[in-house]
């Protein structure tokens, strides 16, 4: 059903004039999520009570999701620690729809991660699908063509009854939306832990490519310029959606009742919207642009107006509707998907509308930029909003929430995994390898990733099973990018500062093992309730750890997202800072794959230092359901050195494959690389080393590399000259069909593959 945008109002409207003459009329501000002092502040700003529409607008824009009111005081640390040298390649940063980075030759890349956690529990398919759609529009709004997506997923225990429902819907939603858009899904993570039952994490990343001169920003300037809403019609879906769902906690009884707040996506509408936007940009028809996501038009109009040099007037009745009888507040705050808002000069309006007609995209002039400093919104000639736009979009409440290191932290850190019994014999070590590989934590993700198209558009160079996704940007020069996202809630629980740095280090290392140079960071910080001092301590520590880590590595945070209230009842999730890193390759033909066997008789070498570090490890989780102690040591200077060596080795052809060591340690890395290359190998452990520690330690800053026999001496010399530990630990044997750890055990590749690939189909197939 479509509804004429000129449908007359059918009920009395609370206008600004009426609000001024009825100061004592009760208003349901508490039901909309506003606290009493916040409501009183709105009255002070306006000099009267707000209209119903203004109240709705302030409530969504001052929500935790939109205003960052609990996190802003800590997030400032990113800007305070970013040096001019770190900013040198950044074309747009924190505060924009997405960060934009110069990658050379006139090209730029924009990338960002956002959460859609709470909607994805309430309605998994639409929650995940619209999460992809929303982050894609953020990228479109910067003037870029979206070229790839990635995802970070966290679910409850793999064998928990509700995990099947949530995982099935989320994976189908991501695949259904991304595949329909023609965007390759080039990587990510899927993690299972009981703490995410009832509160999954669905963090979607999108990457876009643009020429630097095509960069667009979100601002409304130029008196008389027109405001054009284009894309899908506006309906009731998503009323109080992500802006409210992401600002509240779940409980087991009422979560399913929130279904109407989840948006409904149409990827085919978004596909034509992408092409329409790109043609509008190419024609020079856009002054400023903003996507409509959380808080809908309330957000788009207030952000555009507050970022410009004037005011704005909007005629809300002009908005094309698909549902009859919507109130002004509903139209303003609807989170219906696949919509954009553009600022266009009067002389370009006809050309703009013509492009939209070509792509069968509905476009409507709904207002204009004014020379004042107010955002005025009318409904059939009656003023329902008259506000200073910055007070809505940027000057909401800011809280210095109490924070306190938990009383339980000392006991948690004292409970080391060192007390757990360890395997010693060859048979026990073999059984441990298979137990980890056959657990939901380390098994193959093919059951999930094969539902995504990884190679559509033809520019994917590396995807799953590689550590980082690699895309070709310029077909002539071979210039490309590498992207990775990583997180570890277990490490962050043990030490939030170090845990955030470990996530950063792993994402940085995953980009480096492709041969790329890491250049920029984005993040999505998933935590429990900000009203819990222990959670705020975790959050503050993680932010400082991430910011200090970026300084040590010399790469900037370009933007990000905060998701609070990730808890069910009073039980918070593990603190989960997701970190995305972008890298640049001069020539993607020199990228380093994960798979062994590219060269006959490759030498296997382990780069970095292995220590006895099992606290927070997958081994401790699988064998004893244990979480305690201290996370692995972080050495960011060593990570930087490791990246430099890998880049030089890739450039000079000294390494034929590389694979990051993380969960499951060396044993898991060897198995994954051998299975990817469908080739056997023989591992020879150092004589003076503890086999268990060498095989399963999760020490950071390590990489397994395959070195062509003819280059072993040169590569060793390079590592020695730079002070990077490099130990020969085996050889690739293309004639073999097994992984052998000499003197300890042997496992056929077929058994490894069956063990790894059978787990998720058994649980969720």
From Swiss-Prot:
Write out the ranges of the annotated region (Disordered). 1-32
The UniProt regions of compositional bias labelled Polar residues, in chain numbering, are 1-13
Known CDD domains for this protein? PurL_repeat1 (cd02203), PurL_repeat2 (cd02204)
Q: Which reaction does it catalyse?
A: N(2)-formyl-N(1)-(5-phospho-beta-D-ribosyl)glycinamide + L-glutamine + ATP + H2O = 2-formamido-N(1)-(5-O-phospho-beta-D-ribosyl)acetamidine + L-glutamate + ADP + phosphate + H(+)
Q: Which GO terms describe its molecular function?
A: ATP binding; magnesium ion binding; phosphoribosylformylglycinamidine synthase activity
The cellular component terms of Gene Ontology attached to this UniProt record, alphabetical and capped at eight, are: cytoplasm
Q: Name one GO biological process term.
A: 'de novo' IMP biosynthetic process
Positions annotated to bind substrate: 115-118, 137, 263, 335-337, 563
Record's InterPro entries? PRibForGlyAmidine_synth_PurL, PurL_linker, PurM-like_C_dom, PurM-like_C_sf, PurM-like_N, PurM-like_N_sf
Q: EC no.?
A: 6.3.5.3
Positions annotated to bind Mg(2+) 2: 138, 291
Pfam families referenced in this protein's UniProt entry, alphabetically = AIRS (PF00586), AIRS_C (PF02769), FGAR-AT_linker (PF18072)
| Presence of the UniProt keyword Nucleus in the record | no
Q: Which residues participate in ATP binding?
A: 68, 112, 523, 560
Location in or out of the cell: Cytoplasm
Residues reported in the UniProt entry to bind Mg(2+) 1 = 114, 561
Q: In which pathway does it act?
A: Purine metabolism; IMP biosynthesis via de novo pathway; 5-amino-1-(5-phospho-D-ribosyl)imidazole from N(2)-formyl-N(1)-(5-phospho-D-ribosyl)glycinamide: step 1/2
UniProt entry keywords in alphabetical sequence? ATP-binding, Cytoplasm, Ligase, Magnesium, Metal-binding, Nucleotide-binding, Purine biosynthesis
The UniProt similarity line reads: Belongs to the FGAMS family.
What does this protein do, in the record's words? Part of the phosphoribosylformylglycinamidine synthase complex involved in the purines biosynthetic pathway. Catalyzes the ATP-dependent conversion of formylglycinamide ribonucleotide (FGAR) and glutamine to yield formylglycinamidine ribonucleotide (FGAM) and glutamate. The FGAM synthase complex is composed of three subunits. PurQ produces an ammonia molecule by converting glutamine to glutamate. PurL transfers the ammonia molecule to FGAR to form FGAM in an ATP-dependent manner.
What is known about its subunit structure?
Answer: Monomer. Part of the FGAM synthase complex composed of 1 PurL, 1 PurQ and 2 PurS subunits.
Q: Quote the protein name from its UniProt record.
A: Phosphoribosylformylglycinamidine synthase subunit PurL
User: Which taxonomic lineage is given here?
Assistant: Bacteria, Bacillati, Actinomycetota, Actinomycetes, Mycobacteriales
